[in-house]
């Protein structure tokens, strides 16, 4: 019997995908190892067709503002150029009035969402309690803007509050939800492989804790996004391991009939220009390699698309041109206007920190695809 050529294996695999089958992890790794231009073309075409089957041609965007309320942080992640010690030059901590003013400006500019995250500042307490401080952040925004969608606090921040105050994750998430947090960013995931985390973010929560906090949020009715920090030291096998964990967690939320689940997947390629030197040296470049990011984007659509239908590139990381190209590699959303974003821009990203609605619309229209403004949870506006 003739051994099938790589292209026959690839063709058969992609045909099965288009029939609605899920890839095995081994098949996902196989796709990430394809570098022949012809193979890349068929992988791209398959991801684009799947996107069309799963969510249609309309490309969505959200009008939002990022508020990074402090960069004072007790941790020292090897990819982070944002963090500062309290007494370091460049350290900042926004007051409640400043946060309210930024929110008001955003609403005037049509924002429907505030995305709020910050460093892990041990001094951020009210009456000696971390949770009280975070609830005051929520209350500051929600009292004045009760209908604004608040997308706030990563699993790492939830763990930090729980640790500081001796609470369970469920207690923290329930309190934040009841105060007005509408959804949580699935950041701090980086790569969900502890071997990688021990190098790039040894002080961060481990994989099991990230998964537990996200699953708890879903069970308590708080939707989350999912993310992956790619293109630093992780291997294709580890990238797929990460995607497999996300897929399994989404399947669990559906099987257990949890009231919430992942709303989207966002790929975040590593930007090292101003990041700490040791990881920069190890990675050996300062800006993402677009082709690597596009292949992983396509494979993420193929691997996750049956379970997480909305896929978004990061224009902050890739630039708007790179993110627009990702829309033909399996993505169906262009993300938010952001209005400001400190974490990636301080690492040296060249994508900018603010995009007008017109910028995003023009980028989408350049592909002859229709566009629609959406809510955080992917309802059309």
Curated annotation (Swiss-Prot):
It catalyses: 5-amino-6-(D-ribitylamino)uracil + L-tyrosine + S-adenosyl-L-methionine = 5-amino-5-(4-hydroxybenzyl)-6-(D-ribitylimino)-5,6-dihydrouracil + 2-iminoacetate + 5'-deoxyadenosine + L-methionine + H(+). GO terms for molecular function: 4 iron, 4 sulfur cluster binding; 5-amino-6-(D-ribitylamino)uracil--L-tyrosine 4-hydroxyphenyl transferase activity; 7,8-didemethyl-8-hydroxy-5-deazariboflavin synthase activity; iron ion binding. Its cofactor is [4Fe-4S] cluster. Pathway: Cofactor biosynthesis; coenzyme F0 biosynthesis. The keyword ATP-binding does not apply. It comes from the Bacteria. Residues 59-306 form the Radical SAM core domain. It is an enzyme of class 2 (transferase). Its EC number is 2.5.1.147. InterPro entries: Aldolase_TIM, CofH/MnqC-like_C, CofH_family, F420, FO_synthase_su2, rSAM. Binds 1 [4Fe-4S] cluster. The cluster is coordinated with 3 cysteines and an exchangeable S-adenosyl-L-methionine. Keywords: 4Fe-4S, Iron, Iron-sulfur, Metal-binding, S-adenosyl-L-methionine, Transferase. [4Fe-4S] cluster binds at residues 73, 77, 80. Consists of two subunits, CofG and CofH. Catalyzes the radical-mediated synthesis of 5-amino-5-(4-hydroxybenzyl)-6-(D-ribitylimino)-5,6-dihydrouracil from 5-amino-6-(D-ribitylamino)uracil and L-tyrosine. Belongs to the radical SAM superfamily. CofH family. HAMAP family: FO_synth_sub2. This is 5-amino-6-(D-ribitylamino)uracil--L-tyrosine 4-hydroxyphenyl transferase. It comes from Cyanothece sp. (strain PCC 7425 / ATCC 29141).
